[in-house]
Amino acid sequence: AKPSDKKIGGAFYSRFNEFRKPRVFTSYMGTITTVLQQGHELGHAFHYWLMRDLPVVQTEFPMTLTETASTFNEAVIRRYLLDRADEKEAFGMLWQELRSAANFLMNTMVRMDFELAFIEERKKGVVSAKRSVDLMRKAWHEWYGDSTVGADDYLWAYKLHYYKTDQLIYNYPYTVGYLLSQGLLTELDRRDRDFMPFYRAMLRDTGRMTVDEIVERHFGSNASEPAFWEGCMKGALGSIRRFASINPNN
């Protein structure tokens, strides 16, 4: 869609099962953020396109696997740009990497903890705005500690995911997808030219396997063991160390 100062950036992916075709709408605003946003949605489209010949029932994958190809696409784009960046550009790209890590590993979990607490409160009756703020502050402090001044008190009021009545707890799947995408980067480095057959096979299984089964069959690991997820986090931790070593004034 044509950019305009009267618009905000945005993108979404959809699919047409009858025609077996994915579609992406996006507004390119001339920023790296919108490039990554486009990459995210194209990851969704590629995921479905790989499954287009399967029975429709096998193309319906759980939310925990929905965000894997999309976040992996983002990660690949960031890596590509980072490999070709000078130190000043690398600082900006690593900042984007750290923003993603903080969003998927911390902010997303704040949203989930708040939503779970809100559901428990709602069982007792109507939850007031004041009580919602209290619940958000508690969840925020659990994850951010004293690293921020205050909390995003009204995140519950403006975050669209809370109002998708057909999908409860639509938060943590992003964390699972992010961690799996980091694991996929490790597989990309390890497999090199053999990566794409592995990746295609994994994505095609997402509509007929659980996360645990995907991890066991394709990664050869146990999803119930913290070691697998800690291994997936190594890439993000490496980006933090590299970011800390760069002087932005150079």
PLM region descriptions:
Residues 36-37, 48-75:
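Post-HEXXH active-site segment of zinc metalloproteases
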Residues 1-39, 43-47:
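Active-site-adjacent "gating/activation" loops or surface patches in catalytic cores
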Residues 29-33, 43-44, 77-78, 179, ...:
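Short, glycine-/Ser/Thr-/acidic-enriched flexible segments
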Residues 29, 33, 60-64, 101, ...:
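Short, solvent-exposed segments of well-ordered alpha helices
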Residues 62-90, 97-99, 103, 177:
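Post-HExxH zinc-binding segment in Zn-dependent metallohydrolases
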Residues 23-27, 54-61, 93-100, 119:
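Short beta-alpha connecting loops at secondary-structure transitions
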Residues 2-4, 38, 46, 83, ...:
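C-terminal, non-catalytic "cap/extension" segments appended to globular domains
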Residues 14, 44, 48-55, 79-83:
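Conserved helix-loop functional segments at active or binding sites
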